[in-house]
């Protein structure tokens, strides 16, 4: 299989050809993908916020943002600049250290999770063998920051919001992990690159959504609950808790919570596209299209085109899921806290366990179709 364009290897070899040592070349390479990751995720947040406002306005037969740039595309940037310039206030009776570190613990693990998200064969920051496990481990840190923020605010609404966030995250983390384990079992690997490779070769018919329809639904529901999207936004329910754990926050700290929420939503959509929708793979395999038109797979122009189309396909699949999440906000009413916990513990958890056992049985019975 063509491994695509190795950006890291090409960059390091170029620096070595200029006379730099291999160690120094790697040191110069390391900050570049991380900086690109932060910039791309931030731009993705601005685009998602603008899309949510426009789609929400269309659902309600409104216009939405209109004056800040063409079609209001700069409204999100203007709001972000406003929050950056606002005064940073710490309540007099709050724990200043925990109050400050809480938003950082919410945002940093989400950004670090992008390390294992591939956009192509070699278009990944770090292809660790246990990439999926790393993401699950990082996602378990976020509830600590939410609970810490609610506790440190010394406010009853903030504390209740933090407790709700922790309970919600713990309830849905287990079904989420079990749904991922079923995919890992079929691909025989925890690497996100290997999971996409396992879905290649047969086009849309090889995607995991056909072999794991139940796991796909469980993962997406649990991911929306982890992102605290409606109908699962109980930790910040305005009618009940003012703004939940965000009540006492202002300025940049307040913005970090929203950035973390939207970055997490985009991350969840990207992971769904990688785990269940073939990642960068097209519905019709591009290598077969190249054979039909008689193009050499080693052609550099074809490799560049394939890499660009792979990135586009991954992002399009992710934003299709983001679109469904935005529509759900205006379609499904908010659930009660008891309904939320019942859905996680009494419904999704048993179904995810049964799905894992059925996947194991199918893997033994039909090893060719289920990755035996």
Curated annotation (Swiss-Prot):
GO biological process, one term: photosynthesis, light reaction
Residue ranges of the TM segments: 27-47, 97-117, 128-148, 176-196, 204-224, 254-274, 308-328, 347-367
Enzyme Commission number(s) of this protein: 7.1.1.-
GO cellular component: plasma membrane-derived thylakoid membrane
Pfam families: NADHdh
Keywords: Membrane, NAD, NADP, Plastoquinone, Quinone, Thylakoid, Translocase, Transmembrane, Transmembrane helix
MF GO annotations: NADH dehydrogenase activity; oxidoreductase activity, acting on NAD(P)H, quinone or similar compound as acceptor; quinone binding
Membrane protein topology class: Multi-pass membrane protein
Compartments (UniProt record): Cellular thylakoid membrane
Keyword Protein biosynthesis: no
Record bears the keyword Ligase: no
HAMAP family documented for this protein: NDH1_NuoH
Assembly mode: NDH-1 is composed of at least 11 different subunits.
Role of this protein: NDH-1 shuttles electrons from an unknown electron donor, via FMN and iron-sulfur (Fe-S) centers, to quinones in the respiratory and/or the photosynthetic chain. The immediate electron acceptor for the enzyme in this species is believed to be plastoquinone. Couples the redox reaction to proton translocation, and thus conserves the redox energy in a proton gradient.
Protein family: Belongs to the complex I subunit 1 family.
Name of the protein in its database record: NAD(P)H-quinone oxidoreductase subunit 1
Organism: Synechococcus elongatus (strain ATCC 33912 / PCC 7942 / FACHB-805)
Gene: ndhA
């Amino acid at each position: 299989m063509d491994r695509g364009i190795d950006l890291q290897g090409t960059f390091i070899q170029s620096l070595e050809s200029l006379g730099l040592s291999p160690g120094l070349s790697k040191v110069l390479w390391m900050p570049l993908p991380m900086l690109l990751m932060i910039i791309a995720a931030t731009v993705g947040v601005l685009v998602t916020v603008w899309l949510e406002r426009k789609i929400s306005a269309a659902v309600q037969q409104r216009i939405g943002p209109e004056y800040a740039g063409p079609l209001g595309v700069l409204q999100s940037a203007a709001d972000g600049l406003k929050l950056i310039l606002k005064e940073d206030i710490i309540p007099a009776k709050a724990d200043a250290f925990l109050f400050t570190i809480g938003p950082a613990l919410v945002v940093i693990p989400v950004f670090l999770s992008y390390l294992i998200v591939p956009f192509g064969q070699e278009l990944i920051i770090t292809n660790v063998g246990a990439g999926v496990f790393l993401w699950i481990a990082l996602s378990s840190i976020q509830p600590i920051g939410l609970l810490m923020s609610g506790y440190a605010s010394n406010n009853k609404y903030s504390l209740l919001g933090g407790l709700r966030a922790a309970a919600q995250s713990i309830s849905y983390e287990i079904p989420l992990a079990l749904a991922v384990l079923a995919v890992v079992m079929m691909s025989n690997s925890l690497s996100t690159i290997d999971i996409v490779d396992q879905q290649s070769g047969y086009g849309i018919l090889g995607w995991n959504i056909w072999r794991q329809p139940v796991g796909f639904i469980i993962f997406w529901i649990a991911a929306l609950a982890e992102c605290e999207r409606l109908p699962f936004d109980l930790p910040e329910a305005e009618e009940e808790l003012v703004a939940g754990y965000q009540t006492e926050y202002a300025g940049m700290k307040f913005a970090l919570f929203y950035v973390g929420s939207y970055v997490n939503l985009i991350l969840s959509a990207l992971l769904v596209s990688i785990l269940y929708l073939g990642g960068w793979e097209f519905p019709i395999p591009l290598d077969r299209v190249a054979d039909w038109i008689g193009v050499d797979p080693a052609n550099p122009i074809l490799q560049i085109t394939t890499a660009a189309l792979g990135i586009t396909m991954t992002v399009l699949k992710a934003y299709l899921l983001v679109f469904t999440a935005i529509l759900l906000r205006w379609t499904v009413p908010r659930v009660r806290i008891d309904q939320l916990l019942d859905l996680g513990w009494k419904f999704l958890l048993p179904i995810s366990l049964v799905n894992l056992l059925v996947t194991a049985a199918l893997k033994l019975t039909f090893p060719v179709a289920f990755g035996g």
